[in-house]
Amino acid sequence: MTTKFEATTICAVRQNGHNAMAGDGQVTMGEKVVMKGTAHKVRRIYNDQVVVGFAGSVADAFNLEDRFEKKLNEFSGNLQRAAVELAQEWRSDQALQKLEALLIVMNKDDMLLVSGSGEVITPDNDVLAIGSGGNFALAAARAMQLHAKDMSAKEVAEAAIHIAGDIDIFTNHNVISETL
């Protein structure tokens, strides 16, 4: 059985010129058992200049995070180029096509969603969210951006995860966040 991070929530926010990404800590085995409540699904890479968050199979997510960091090194930290190259490789390599994960990658200038079907998506409204609670976090973060402009990016991202955790049974309130 493969451990999945699908039952997780990651939210990235750009607010007031700052970026933050937050994720919950729950790892669920199947649909009935919480295996861990303190997993770190949001991490800094590339000399702490890039934050990556992932949802999907644990092994697949780590594999893709490692491949993405190699692409960042290959392209001297160019986030968009590294993301596009990873997406192209992911889509064209038959072994990689079987990987079940999504990545949100972010530096001080850009925020991108990278999927296994070859998409590299830049959000229209400075918020991205993935995982089982992703839609709840996305809606909450967008509402806070519109109506609570005094909140920091970190406060918005963390609050969005907490709101998702109140609704989604696969998301807990042990929030890990990183800011840029």
Curated annotation (Swiss-Prot):
EC supergroup of this enzyme: hydrolase
One GO CC term, this protein: HslUV protease complex
SUPFAM superfamilies membership: N-terminal nucleophile aminohydrolases (Ntn hydrolases)
Organism domain of life: Bacteria
Keywords: Allosteric enzyme, Cytoplasm, Hydrolase, Metal-binding, Protease, Sodium, Threonine protease
MF terms (GO), sorted A to Z: metal ion binding; threonine-type endopeptidase activity
Single GO BP term: proteolysis involved in protein catabolic process
Annotated catalytic residues: 8
Activation/inhibition comment: Allosterically activated by HslU binding.
Pfam family, one: Proteasome
Entry EC number(s): 3.4.25.2
Reaction equations catalysed: ATP-dependent cleavage of peptide bonds with broad specificity
Protein location: Cytoplasm
Main location: cytoplasm
Residues annotated as binding Na(+): 165, 168, 171
Function: Protease subunit of a proteasome-like degradation complex believed to be a general protein degrading machinery.
Subunit structure: A double ring-shaped homohexamer of HslV is capped on each side by a ring-shaped HslU homohexamer. The assembly of the HslU/HslV complex is dependent on binding of ATP.
Annotated family: Belongs to the peptidase T1B family. HslV subfamily.
Protein name as annotated: ATP-dependent protease subunit HslV
Source organism (scientific name): Lactiplantibacillus plantarum (strain ATCC BAA-793 / NCIMB 8826 / WCFS1)
